[in-house]
């Protein structure tokens, strides 16, 4: 392959990555819209942190990461951030 072809391929792959990033951001936005709905369904701050649910989510994403040949530690760290941000959001919205 020539250098020119490599540059074209690199640009194409980067564009593909950018498109995937855009989809990921949209999906994260969708996830947080659902968290807003959950917030409206919870009646008290005692309901914000569900340790059983958190454990289930983290085990689930870890398993899915392994099946997709992705480092599960990376995925768990990302989901821990999602969970922390959801807890912050719920804490700020739930009054009781």
Put a short name on every predicted segment.
Residues 1-96:
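Domain-level signature for soluble enzymes in the chorismate/prephenate branch of the shikimate pathway
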């Amino acid at each position: 392959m020539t250098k020119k072809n490599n540059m074209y391929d690199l640009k194409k792959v980067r564009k593909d990555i950018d498109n995937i990033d855009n989809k990921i951001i949209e999906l994260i936005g969708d996830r947080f819209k659902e968290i807003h709905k959950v917030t409206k369904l919870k009646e008290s701050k005692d309901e914000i942190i569900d340790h059983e649910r958190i454990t289930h989510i983290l085990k689930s994403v870890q398993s899915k990461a392994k099946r997709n040949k992705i480092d599960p530690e990376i995925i768990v760290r990302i989901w821990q951030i999602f969970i922390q941000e959801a807890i912050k959001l719920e804490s700020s919205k739930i009054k009781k």
